[in-house]
């Protein structure tokens, strides 16, 4: 199958981004803008396009970094690989073609690689994975289940319905909270990048209160500067009638899907229910702007999970992360080093709990640096 492999050069971003945006599913983490974000932290991108079966080509933006002093590089395909379509009948050829591309072209471009981690945004038991077809295909191609880096489940809101139907999908109490915030004079505004400092202050307060790790302010500026020029990012604030920002969301888009990976609120925002109005407006205006789905990005637990479920949508469980081990010793050493790094970072920031590599969002993905 090697004669059908195509290596997309790093500067062919327009072709690549079009492929990802048209994929089913596609993810903002597979866009060239995300590679631009991660390049600041020493990650390089290798874009692979393989196979040409019934489901079309399968491709992945592979982020690669060699953490010192290890001699191996780690490779990660965040929310990929992606394809124009997935079917149970075509899964075996697709997985095999992508594994071959990793073993050959990736080694050629990136050198000594311990393992490649993938986490395709495919629903477990969904149409593509009927009777476990994709999971069987991944195993047959040499992949094995691995610890997750990104959320292994989420809640997706279908924006095909009209606004009245979306409003009706909110729990009654949630609609009351939205109206309460409006009555209190809370408004939602789109903002420019010059307000990222305010975003970060609220996000930091939220992280300290909830006990999760976030990155530096510059990291979120990098996200904004990579996606916003292409019309793929929005910064929203819920403000009191006095103009005080009390809740915020940073949204990112790929194709028809809007994702909310970052957001938070102040204590005052919680008291005024501004966060309810903010999320409703994010959903409503995303539909207005032509989006077809809204990803709440993870299910979380406890109060956050309860909050998200009140906005409707459908709970989706993904196939999870899978490793293609290219060097068994390197894979073992990398795993131990990553776990130790997470513990050190949690202690440095004074956060309780054991933590894990997945809790740290895994370098090439979310809030890890």
Residue positions per predicted region:
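Active-site/acyl-donor-binding loops of N-acyltransferases
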Residues: 2, 9-13, 37, 135-164, ...
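A short, internal acetyl-CoA/4′-phosphopantetheine-binding micro-motif in the GNAT/acyltransferase core
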Residues: 78-91, 160, 263-272
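Aromatic (often tryptophan-rich) hydrophobic motifs at membrane interfaces
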Residues: 97-104, 222-335
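Conserved GNAT acetyl-CoA-binding A-motif
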Residues: 108-124, 286-297
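Short, flexible/disordered intra-domain loops and linkers
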Residues: 87-93, 123-132
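A conserved beta-strand-loop-helix scaffold within acyl/acetyltransferase catalytic domains
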Residues: 3, 7-54, 58-70, 120-127, ...
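Short secondary-structure subsegments characteristic of cysteine-rich extracellular domains
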Residues: 89-110
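Short catalytic/ligand-binding loop motif for oxyanion handling, primarily in non-cytosolic enzymes
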Residues: 68-73, 85, 124-128, 303-305
């Amino acid at each position: 199958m090697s004669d059908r492999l195509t290596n997309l050069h790093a500067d062919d971003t327009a072709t690549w981004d079009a492929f990802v945006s048209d994929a089913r599913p596609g993810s903002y983490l597979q866009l060239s803008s995300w590679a631009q974000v991660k390049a600041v932290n020493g990650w390089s991108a290798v874009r692979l396009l393989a196979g040409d079966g019934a489901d079309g080509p399968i491709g992945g933006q592979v982020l690669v970094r060699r953490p010192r002093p290890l001699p191996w590089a780690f490779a990660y395909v965040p929310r990929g690989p992606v394809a124009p379509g997935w079917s149970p009948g075509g899964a075996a050829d697709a997985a095999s073609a992508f594994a071959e591309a990793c073993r050959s072209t990736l080694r050629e471009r990136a050198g000594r690689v311990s393992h490649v981690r993938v986490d395709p945004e495919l629903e477990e038991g969904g149409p593509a994975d009927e009777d476990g077809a994709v999971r069987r295909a991944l195993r047959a191609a040499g992949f094995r289940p691995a610890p997750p880096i990104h959320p292994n489940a989420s809640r997706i809101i279908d924006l095909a319905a009209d606004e009245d139907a979306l409003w009706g999908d909110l729990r009654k109490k949630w609609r009351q909270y939205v109206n309460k915030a409006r009555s209190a004079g809370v408004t939602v505004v789109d903002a420019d990048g010059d307000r990222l400092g305010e975003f970060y202050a609220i996000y930091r307060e939220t992280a300290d209160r909830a006990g999760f790790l976030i990155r530096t302010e510059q990291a979120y500026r990098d996200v904004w500067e990579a996606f916003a020029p292409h019309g793929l990012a929005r910064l929203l604030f819920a403000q009191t009638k006095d103009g005080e920002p009390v809740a915020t969301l940073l949204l990112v888009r790929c194709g028809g899907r809007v994702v909310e990976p970052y957001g938070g609120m102040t204590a005052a925002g919680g008291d005024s229910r501004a966060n309810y109005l903010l999320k409703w407006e994010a959903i409503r205006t995303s539909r207005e702007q032509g989006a077809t789905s809204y990803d709440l990005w993870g299910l979380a637990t406890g109060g956050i999970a309860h909050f998200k479920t009140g906005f409707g949508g459908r709970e989706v469980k993904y196939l999870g992360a899978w490793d293609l081990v290219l060097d068994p010793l390197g894979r073992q050493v990398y795993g131990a080093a990553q776990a130790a790094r997470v513990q050190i970072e949690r202690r440095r920031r004074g956060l309780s709990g054991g933590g894990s590599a997945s809790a740290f969002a895994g370098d090439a993905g979310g809030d890890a640096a």
